[in-house]
Amino acid sequence: LELFARHGFAAVSMRQIAAHVGVQAGALYNYTPDKQSLLFGLMQRHMEELLQARRAQSVVANPVAQLEAFSRFHIRFHLARPDAVFIAYMELRNLTPENFATIESLRRRYEDHFLDWWRSAQ
């Protein structure tokens, strides 16, 4: 995560990742088949944690208070995970089309929380 955030997905090698986590390069393949799978897993975990944390938020009846709660949640969640957020937004272009579609679907689910509020507030 740190290496991708600092140097970018394309600039980081599997050898660098292995050295960073303290294993031999060959041993890294026991945990992930390739760099693409690692990137996808990091992004997927980030989005699933975001969705889970959002579901855990209490629902407020007042639309203005609901927008405020959503905004505070969104900002706090993202400030607590700057590397994951950076990767989730900046490295989408490096996903395979299939992996991109999966992450984009998770992102749409999160955005739907805001759109649901918007519709209910009208």
Would you name each region that the model predicts?
Residues 3, 49, 57, 77, ...:
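Short alpha-helical functional segments enriched in proximate histidine and acidic residues
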Residues 6, 30-31, 77, 95, ...:
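Histidine kinase transmitter module recognition
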Residues 6-10, 60, 81:
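Short coil/turn segments at alpha/beta junctions that flank glycine-rich nucleotide-binding fingerprints
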Residues 45-51, 98-122:
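Amphipathic alpha-helical packing segments from all-alpha helical-bundle domains
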Residues 79-98:
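Amphipathic alpha-helical segments used for helix-helix packing
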Residues 42-69:
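Amphipathic alpha-helical linker/stalk segments
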Residues 16, 37, 41, 66-69, ...:
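Alpha-helical elements of Rossmann-like donor-binding domains used by nucleotide-donor carbohydrate transfer enzymes
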Residues 3-37, 41:
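Helix-turn-helix
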